[in-house]
């Protein structure tokens, strides 16, 4: 069973980390305006493949309980206004913060944060599906969220 509350906790901790390291307002959600903001836009949630290999936990009285599965949260980091020196600088700061903080501690769980490659076609599809113009961004993911 997936602990749904930890996904928001993970994304909140990610936003807090970016806010701390960039000194800029960080918003969780789809980019919607041109204020000086960094957006963390989660666009895909998947069960981590390694979760399928976990044996059920054995609790007293030999009851087998399924392990909590691990989630990978794919997200885009977008700085607005995007195509300005300030926006590009904020985007570079956010990318650097992700690279310098590869592990976030969420309660008693450590999750991995990393940049990721995203095919141009997939990226264009994400923006098109959301009805917003394609712009420069950082593709990243959180591995191990529970």
Which sequence ranges carry the predicted segments?
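Oligomerization/assembly interface segments of phage tail-like spikes and tubes
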Residues: 65-82, 92, 134-144
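Conserved NTP-handling cores and scaffolds of large molecular machines
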Residues: 18-22, 61, 98-105
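Short alpha-helix boundary/capping segments
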Residues: 6, 63, 82-89
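A broadly used, surface-exposed interaction patch
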Residues: 49-77, 86
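Small/polar-rich, solvent-exposed N-terminal microdomains that initiate assembly or binding
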Residues: 1-58
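A general structural signal for short secondary-structure junctions and capping/turn motifs
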Residues: 31-33, 67, 129-133
